[in-house]
Amino acid sequence: MKNYILIIISFFLITCDTIEPPYLQSNNQSSQKIVLIEKFTGHKCSNCPDATRKIKELQELYQDAIIPISIHPGGLKEFTDTDDNYIYDFTTNSSDVIASDMGASFLPLGTVNRIDGGISNRCFTKDQWASEIEKLLYDSEGLPRPKKFNIDISTVFNTTKKELTIETNIIALSDVKNNFNLVIIIIEDGIIAPQIDGTEFIESYEHNNIYRCAVNGTYGENISNSNGLENQFEYQSINTLILNQDANHNWTSDWDNINNCYVVAYVYETESLIIQDSVKKAIIDE
């Protein structure tokens, strides 16, 4: 018997360039469907940290398949207003509109891809989130539901000007009917400020996933017409934002927390308001 040995030798030439600011970042795509949770919360809401702990449990279970956003509704001032003990203002005009439109009549509550149901319009209690997430991620046979859209985000951040340019590219992965919008927002982690937790006042509580601003409007921009989209339809959106007090009143000249900020983009069907697919990426990857 003769043995034949085929040896294939490949040579790769790798060159390294020095990259200076501004920095370009892009998110990695996966085939996994992602669910967006809008958690309505408040720093004066004694039960809200329980909802935050529930979010952490769900993240341990579903990993990157969920994206949580924390919204402090300005309309529920008894939970979100500022005073001598709670000096940090987490509210924004855009998030106030969302909280009102979604039916956040008390706290804590949360939407799950903005599907209908729950106890208040589209709002569910924290103990209802898991079952709704499960139904959105998996079909009745336990198979993963396919994504409808591929959303890719690239960012360029100029550290000197605090200028952020976001390029968002969308591809429809199948023929889809109806009308769709793209929403782009900024969220921020690692904000240390007071929070009531049960009966305990915590002066140095870490607030994460905080809704900071809407980049392209509260309800975004249209990417289609009423006739829907064909498979492999492509759409590109480029937006530039200065991270200063015009974008969010907390982004003062001495603010320096860009390493804890993220871009979240999602596509929703305009008639039902139901979110189809979402993605999140750090503005500056470490």
Language-model features and meaning:
Residues 70-286:
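Short, conserved sequence motifs used for protein processing/export or organelle targeting and
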Residues 32-35, 63-67, 106-107:
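Loop/turn elements at helix/coil->beta-strand transitions in domains of secreted/extracellular proteins
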Residues 31, 60-62, 100-101:
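A general structural signal for stabilizing positions within well-ordered secondary structure
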